[in-house]
Amino acid sequence: MEIRRRPPNPTVRVENLEYAVPHREAQAKNILEEIVWHKDIEIKNFKKIVSLEDLIKKIENLPTPKDFYKNILESKIKPGVIAEIKKASPSKGVIRKDFNPENIAICYEGLGASCISVLTDKKFFQGSYEILETVRKSTNLPLLCKDFIISAYQIYKARVSGADAILLIAAILSDDDLIYLKKIADNLKMSVLVEVHNSYELERILKLKSFNLIGINNRDLKTFKTDLKTSKELMNTYADIFLKQNIIPISESGINCAEDLESLRSIGIMGVLIGETFMRETDIEQSFKKLFNSI
């Protein structure tokens, strides 16, 4: 793992007293670490409202999840589009003030998106599982729960809220965590998009031989800056491996124009996840057509 999963804050016992001692490294080193540390608090709060057992019971009556992989593979638009619903981000603040998830989902489906990604992180992205539920009622497309998943509880909550797929981020999970969380998703018949940012993370994922959807994030999650060079460099090295192993490579973040799309398609990228480019435009339909009508 590239980040610390929890803040160092050792507990000290003196006779019958127990207290926490401020640690010199108790401050998060970057945005990603801060987000992950907050997830522990968020999950504990969720469990106070709905137990894991209750979530599991609710899943029993749900329909089979939609096939995320198949929808991207068979997309009429090339590369297939995972269109994202995102109100805000830590680096940009509020991206879309006129935020209507239902209308956005309907628009995406009508334009030919393969799947929809929904941000569910509340503190940093102003998302929620309630938004995911709203989107589920508004579209028949497969839905990706876009969160910083570190616990099985989040996967069950995502499924209950209508998700067909989850995101697992290699940078915040050990190999054992990745395998365990993938098994949970498999048992629920959910798809898993695993996200990498560099060759080290990608090598880890390929050795696990468990994932057929790999997202190459062009955004450095420590600085939140984007560069398509990340996708291009990894595809230059691993495109043949993806093809032989029937892995769908998906480029995420920093895709702003038709030229970006064409350059990614030409190197073998089969799917793209685009959010901010659509969210910052008043007319999503026009923005979508501007990107895809010319390729």
Swiss-Prot record:
Transmembrane segments: none
EC number of this enzyme: 4.1.1.48
Keywords attached to this entry: Amino-acid biosynthesis, Aromatic amino acid biosynthesis, Decarboxylase, Lyase, Tryptophan biosynthesis
Pfam family, one: IGPS
Keyword Amino-acid biosynthesis listed: yes
Keyword check for Cell division: no
Gene Ontology BP annotations: L-tryptophan biosynthetic process
Gene3D superfamilies for the chain: Aldolase class I
Molecular-function annotations in GO: indole-3-glycerol-phosphate synthase activity; phosphoribosylanthranilate isomerase activity
Superkingdom of the source species: Bacteria
InterPro entries tied to this protein: Aldolase_TIM, Indole-3-glycerol_P_synth, Indole-3-glycerol_P_synth_dom, Indole-3-GlycerolPSynthase_CS, RibuloseP-bd_barrel
Enzyme category, top tier: lyase
Pathway: Amino-acid biosynthesis; L-tryptophan biosynthesis; L-tryptophan from chorismate: step 4/5
PROSITE patterns for this protein: IGPS
Reaction equations catalysed: 1-(2-carboxyphenylamino)-1-deoxy-D-ribulose 5-phosphate + H(+) = (1S,2R)-1-C-(indol-3-yl)glycerol 3-phosphate + CO2 + H2O
Family that this chain belongs to: Belongs to the TrpC family.
HAMAP family cross-referenced by the UniProt entry: IGPS_B (MF_00134_B)
Protein name (database record): Indole-3-glycerol phosphate synthase
Organism: Prochlorococcus marinus (strain AS9601)
Protein's gene: trpC
